Swiss-Prot record:
GO terms for biological process: ribosomal small subunit biogenesis; translation. SUPFAM superfamilies: Alpha-L RNA-binding motif. SMART domains: Ribosomal_S4, S4. Residues 90-152 form the S4 RNA-binding domain. It comes from Prochlorococcus marinus (strain MIT 9312). It holds the Pfam family Ribosomal_S4. This is Small ribosomal subunit protein uS4. GO terms for molecular function: rRNA binding; structural constituent of ribosome.
Length: 202
């Protein structure tokens, strides 16, 4: 399953608010599809699937990528669910989003893919790069790159930069100072249900 490129509001109507995917909110309260039908009680599988889809669409990863992250999270010490969220939060495109360099994760991914972002002083165009403590994320030294980011950083997608990121707004740089705490994940998600979803699949 590839990365989603369809209407974003259609997804948020079905799954709820996804701050990484879009800043817009749907004016329609009903989920997409036919209406007026009696709502059936959802199965446990359907609930787990929905939580998994929230992660996929919010962070903009493919099913194949998410499976790899789940395997990696399992291999690490500690809670698999927390490890999974941290792996997704540490993606370069997401770090750029949390710093305010891009208004959404897709917007931040475009900045990375087009060579506007640096890691430790070198241009890096790999959106899925796993940022680590001590990494300094910056913007390429040219007018076009800086102009793109300066417009975004004045109106960031999320109001607050999490405490594990140290933003130097005038210099357009951010340093990773530690691990992302669970409470600072900007998505309403039950990560344990995601882990359960993959328990028999991975």
């Amino acid at each position: 399953m590839s990365r989603y490129r369809g209407p974003r509001l259609r997804v948020t109507r079905r799954l709820g608010e996804l701050p990484g995917l879009t800043r817009k909110a749907s004016k329609k309260s009903n989920p997409p599809g036919q209406h007026g039908q009696a709502r059936r009680k959802r199965s446990e599988y359907a609930i787990r699937l929905e939580e998994k889809q929230k992660l996929r669409f919010n962070y903009g990863v493919s099913e194949k990528q998410l499976v790899r992250y789940v395997k990696k999270a399992r291999a690490q010490e500690g809670s698999t669910g927390t490890n999974l969220l941290r792996l997704l939060e540490n993606r370069l495109d997401n770090v750029c989003f949390r710093l305010g360099f891009g208004g959404t994760i897709p917007g931040s991914r475009q900045l990375v893919n087009h060579g506007h972002v640096t890691v430790n002083g070198k241009v890096l165009d790999i959106a899925g790069y796993q940022c680590k403590s001590g990494d300094v994320i910056g913007i390429k030294e040219n007018k076009a790159s800086k102009k793109l980011v300066e417009g975004n950083i004045e109106f960031p997608g999320l109001a607050n930069v999490p405490p594990h990121l140290d933003l130097d707004k005038p210099k357009l740089t951010g340093k990773i100072t530690g691990k992302c705490d669970r409470e600072w994940v900007a998505l309403e998600i039950n990560e344990l249900l995601v882990v359960e979803y993959y328990s028999r699949k991975v």
